[in-house]
Amino acid sequence: MSAPRDVVVVLLDSLNRHMLGAYGGTEFDTPNLDRLAARSVRFTNHHTGSLPCMPARHDLLVGALDFPWRPWGSIEIWEDAITTLLRQHAGVSTMLASDHPHLFETGGENYHVDFGAWDYLRGHEDDPWRTRPDPSWIGAPALSARRPTWERGYDVSRTWFRDEVDFPGPKTMVAAASWLDGELSAAREPHERALLVVDEFDPHEPFDTPEPWASRYDPDWNGDRLIWPPYARSQEQSGLTERESIHLRSQYGAKLSMIDHWLGRILEVVDQHDAWDTTAFILCTDHGHYLGEHGFWGKPQVAVHPELGHIPLLVSWPGAAPTTSGALTTTVDLHATLCDVFGVTPEHRTHGQSLVPILEGTASSVREWALCGVWGREVHVADATRTFAKAPVDENRPLSMFSNRWSTMPIRAIPGYRMPRPDERAWLDRSPGSDVPVIRQPFDPSDDIPFWGMGGFRGDVLYDREEADGGEFRNRSGGDADKEMTDLLVEALRTIEAPAEQLVRLGVG
């Protein structure tokens, strides 16, 4: 079995595993994802690591778990993205095609810079693309006014989308397919190789699509289209009626099916060049998105349940027969796999395990546990069949942020929100495997903390994933298995040399 010459990585944001045909979903159509799955190793035990969007990109592109040290931020000065390694040491042609606005704002501003080339396709979510609506037509739909002011920036961008191909998702897939076609058509030397990363923000909200997608799964809806899901920890808190909930879910499905359709453009390029025998194709996501399951909506401040954390992974590998793997895997393993394929070794500490032995059939597993979490919230550990979420104790303290970039997600939606800057409480510490001093800022209970860490805690959660996949969710915490899973959690945190205060705030230190 020969190693792939080229690699394509397509990350679809907020991709719900249980809604894909390849994973048993029947609610929405995903023919191209299903077509890819039919030629791939389909991983059924793949999980998020750091949440949400940018922490997950850090796991993928840098290979080090982010959430034990900080909430959301750019690449630190002691780290290198894999694209840096490929440029400096491997001579690989690298390309990023993306409509993901967080990659190009404070907190994500340097993930793209070491790609050989990058194409930012504008207009998704709150991307500040236009300052005024397109004055030449009145083609934008009447979007629901039930949304915060910051989200209305999308309405301005939306007036510039005249046809389906003008939407950010289709634009991104067309741009990626065009680049790949050019690369595979070029008269390359035998040593020339390529990595294409498609960071596609769909099916992330807003769940806005043109017809015929918009009415595909809810043709009887007569009101304004609802495209902005609430972030809520209960159905009551969401403010949605039962009928509105059904409609909003249908709009997620519309966006999922639309981006699946345009994904076909990239698959067609690989088909046309007969490049499957020389190309590894990885389809992944950062996390799922609650659409009313357990009463949750969006990505609220709750423990990570299967709909959010148990995610799809498809890998088409040259010479590998289509099959299913139940190996436990997580996002940092994709970084390790890319390093293995291209023969590069990071100098900074990483946490992934290459999946190449599984893909080539020489191993059935590469890890015994996987960590997952949001900075400042529960820490989760998964073994082969169970996931355990340990909730903080004692006011969730001590809690510190470790970073020299000191950039985090802009929180424009929360008036008056101010996260503390480094102050007299800060001191210089070290990150594992690095001699570079890093600012360590403690947070007091009176401090604002980053948005994703806000909210109360509901205690420990332990669930069997096979049960949960079958539609039955039972919190098994409180029994004899708690100690076993707590011991595994402590072992995992100590293995990655997480800050000792993580054990203290979780009540296990």
Walk through the language-model features, giving the residues of each.
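C-terminal, low-complexity/hydrophilic appendages and adjacent surface loops
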Residues: 306, 374-477, 509
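Active-site-proximal N-terminal segment of extracellular/periplasmic enzymes that hydrolyze or transfer
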Residues: 1-44, 50, 458, 471-483
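Short, solvent-exposed turn/loop segments enriched in Gly/Ser/Thr/Pro and often Arg
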Residues: 23-24, 40-61, 73-76, 96-107, ...
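A long, amphipathic alpha-helix that forms part
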Residues: 167-188, 232-281, 341, 492
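Catalytic-site neighborhoods of secreted/periplasmic enzymes
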Residues: 59-162
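Substrate-binding rim/cap in mid-to-C-terminal beta-strand-loop elements of soluble/periplasmic
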Residues: 60-62, 238-243, 264-268, 272, ...
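Active-site regions of oxyanion-processing enzymes, predominantly non-cytosolic
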Residues: 2-9, 108-119, 149-157, 162-224, ...
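Histidine-centered active-site microenvironments of extracellular/periplasmic hydrolases
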Residues: 28, 206-221, 269-320, 330
